[in-house]
Amino acid sequence: MEQTYVMVKPDGVERGLIGEIVAKIEKKGIKLVAGKLIQIDRKLAEQHYAEHIGKPFFEDLIGFITSGPVFAMVLEGDDVIKIARRMMGKTNPLEADAGTIRAEYAVHTNRNVIHGSDSPESAKREIQLFFEPHEILSYEKAVDIWV
C-alpha cells in the first residue's frame, strides 16, 4: 500500500481549514495513518525544501512555512500520491481545476494552503523528516471493502 506526506500549511491552519481538508481526503476513501499539529523550525524547513536552496523565493518560502503551525499527515492507499496531488490541484490556485483544494481555499501561489509529496521518493523522505515510525499507525477502516 502506497503512502504519501501531505501538510496543511500555516495559512490553512490559521484559517481553520484542517477539518474540511481532512474530511475531503477521507471522503475520497484515503486512509489517514498519522497526523499532528507542529511548528516547523528553520532547520526542518530547510531540510524539507532543500531542493529550493539558492532560488530567489527560498527565504520567503522558509519564512512562510515557519510563520505558524502546520498539520502534517501521512496518507495511505492505492495510488495515493497521484490521487492526493489531483485533489490538491495545481500550485497556482488560479490554474487549479474547480473542486480541488487549492481552487476552493487558496488565493496565491505562495500561500496555497497545502503541500503534498510529488513522488514515491519524496514521500519517503518527507515522511521520515516529519514522523517517527511509531507515529504511523496501521488499522482497518469499515469502508475499505467499498473503496
UniProtKB/Swiss-Prot annotation:
Catalytic activity: a 2'-deoxyribonucleoside 5'-diphosphate + ATP = a 2'-deoxyribonucleoside 5'-triphosphate + ADP; a ribonucleoside 5'-diphosphate + ATP = a ribonucleoside 5'-triphosphate + ADP
Record-listed E.C. numbers: 2.7.4.6
Any Pfam family matching the protein: NDK
GO biological process: CTP biosynthetic process; GTP biosynthetic process; UTP biosynthetic process
Subcellular location(s) per record: Cytoplasm
Molecular-function GO term, any one: nucleoside diphosphate kinase activity
Cofactor field: Mg(2+)
GO cellular component, one term: cytoplasm
Residues the record marks as active site: H115 (pros-phosphohistidine intermediate)
Gene3D superfamilies, alphabetized: Nucleoside diphosphate kinase-like domain
Keyword annotations from UniProtKB, A to Z: ATP-binding, Cytoplasm, Kinase, Magnesium, Metal-binding, Nucleotide metabolism, Nucleotide-binding, Phosphoprotein, Transferase
Primary site of residence: cytoplasm
Keyword set includes rRNA-binding: no
Entry binding sites for ATP: K9, F57, R85, T91, R102, N112
Cited function: Major role in the synthesis of nucleoside triphosphates other than ATP. The ATP gamma phosphate is transferred to the NDP beta phosphate via a ping-pong mechanism, using a phosphorylated active-site intermediate.
Family per record: Belongs to the NDK family.
Subunit and partners: Homotetramer.
NCBIfam families named among the record's database cross-references: PRK00668.1 (NF001908)
Protein name: Nucleoside diphosphate kinase
Organism: Listeria welshimeri serovar 6b (strain ATCC 35897 / DSM 20650 / CCUG 15529 / CIP 8149 / NCTC 11857 / SLCC 5334 / V8)
Gene responsible for this protein: ndk
